[in-house]
């Protein structure tokens, strides 16, 4: 079995400029690495007429249960202005105890840590009696149509059972060991267009200004108290993200006014119920103003919570022993691919410190990378000892 080093593998992965939509060969590269340490692999490429094709990878070591899965993504966000970087973002460099490069934090180093952990674990436990799998996508930072969502559908159709999934996203705000994600809020975007009647500002009786209704709707939506939050979740929150009145003249009442809003909601709601509540507000105000309207919704994911159990506490205690910090169980932050995986398996998220993700100069502490590898190794060790005892 080939020996793997987490720093070396992280560097190799970062060298691939796998900005979302561009695989650049990184999935195939990881597949070869996994094959060398005994994994059976399958590259899954999905296409959709409304989006770009995406390569994904599912790999499994062993055939027995339980199946411990690690999920992550190899696509990265664009590096931005290259002149703002001290190094080429796709030629990783180590400086002052940090590995610098695009994806060093989110999340190629986490993948490198887990693959190294599997190598360390399987070397000492050649017949551990279960399975370890990896679900790796090339589209988490993008629209995520042909990524983890379709891999989950594929696994479900094949009746591939995953007993537990650890998602390796950077979950810690400032220090390694601070936070485990046990759920995520739901996310829904609304695009609202209010249709009026264009006219001269001096003759408002001959027109119907759609901005009047739009402003009233947005004000009302911001005033809605959806809930007070729960023990595990923050209160549901709606933010207005765009307002547009396409009108270049000061003496013209516009015929169209539009706005977008995003709502992050907890598990007291579903997107369906929120749509009904919001639609009621829109309809009432538009009727009052004699305006027509059009509303379109897109749902990134529903809110979910993995209730803390023995696996949660085992992972929490394992992290505490290595970092000397007891991780908080949290549902804060944005969406992740856990929203898809939770449909087939209980899942938690734990990875690196996310302070530099998506930033110029993205980096990871070499100490954190080493400790994350140790944490992942110990989690595997404790999981299979407990499950197969």
Regions found by a protein language model. Give the residues of each.
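Acidic, glycine-rich active-site loops and adjacent beta-strand->loop/helix elements
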Residues: 43, 74-76, 135-144, 168-172, ...
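N-terminal helical capping/dimerization or prosegment-like subdomains
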Residues: 1-80, 256-260, 274-277, 366-368
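Active-site metal-coordination/substrate-binding segment of hydrolases
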Residues: 67-133, 158, 368-371
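A structural signal for isolated positions on well-ordered beta-strands in alpha/beta enzyme cores
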Residues: 42, 69, 133-135, 294
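Acidic/histidine-rich catalytic neighborhood of metal-dependent amide-processing enzymes
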Residues: 107-183, 388-389
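Acidic-glycine-rich active-site phosphate/pyrophosphate-binding loop
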Residues: 79-94, 166, 183-193, 317-318
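A structural signal for short hydrophobic beta-strand segments in well-ordered beta-sheet cores
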Residues: 59, 92-94, 240-243
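Metal-dependent amide/peptide-bond hydrolase catalytic core
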Residues: 1, 171-175, 182, 188-389
């Amino acid at each position: 079995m080939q020996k793997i080093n987490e720093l070396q593998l992280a560097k190799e992965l970062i060298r691939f400029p796998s900005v979302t939509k561009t695989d650049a060969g990184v999935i195939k590269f990881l597949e070869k690495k996994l094959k060398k340490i005994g994994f059976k692999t399958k590259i899954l490429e999905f296409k959709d007429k409304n989006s770009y094709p995406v390569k994904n990878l599912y790999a499994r070591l062993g055939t027995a249960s339980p199946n411990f899965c690690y999920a992550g993504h190899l696509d990265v966000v664009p590096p931005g202005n290259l002149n703002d970087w001290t190094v080429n973002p796709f030629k990783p460099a180590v400086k002052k105890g940090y590995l610098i490069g695009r994806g060093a934090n989110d999340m190629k180093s986490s993948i490198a840590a887990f693959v190294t952990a599997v190598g360390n674990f399987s070397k000492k436990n050649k017949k551990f009696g279960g399975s370890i799998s990896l679900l790796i996508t090339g589209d988490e930072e993008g629209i995520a149509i042909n990524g983890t969502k379709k891999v989950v559908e594929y696994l479900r159709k094949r009746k591939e059972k995953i007993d537990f999934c650890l998602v390796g996203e950077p979950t810690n705000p400032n220090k390694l060991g601070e936070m485990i994600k046990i759920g995520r809020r739901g996310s829904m975007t609304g695009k609202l267009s209010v249709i009026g009647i264009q006219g001269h500002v001096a003759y408002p009786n001959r027109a119907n200004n759609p901005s009047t209704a739009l402003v009233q709707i947005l004000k009302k939506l911001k005033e809605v108290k959806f809930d007070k939050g729960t023990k595990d979740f923050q209160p549901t929150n709606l933010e207005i993200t765009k307002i547009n009145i396409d009108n270049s003249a000061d003496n013209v009442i516009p015929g169209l006014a539009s706005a977008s809003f995003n709502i992050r909601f907890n598990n007291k709601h579903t997107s369906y119920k929120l749509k009904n509540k919001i639609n009621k507000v829109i309809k009432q105000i538009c009727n009052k103003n004699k305006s027509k309207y059009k509303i379109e919704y897109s749902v990134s994911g529903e809110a979910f919570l993995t209730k803390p159990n023995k696996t949660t506490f085992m992972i929490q205690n394992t992290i505490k022993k290595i970092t000397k910090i007891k991780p908080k169980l949290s549902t804060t932050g944005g969406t992740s691919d856990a929203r898809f995986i939770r449909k087939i398996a209980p899942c938690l998220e734990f990875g690196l410190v996310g302070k530099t993700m998506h930033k110029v100069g993205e980096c990871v502490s070499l100490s954190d990378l080493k400790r994350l590898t140790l944490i992942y190794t110990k989690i595997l060790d404790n999981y299979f000892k407990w499950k197969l005892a």
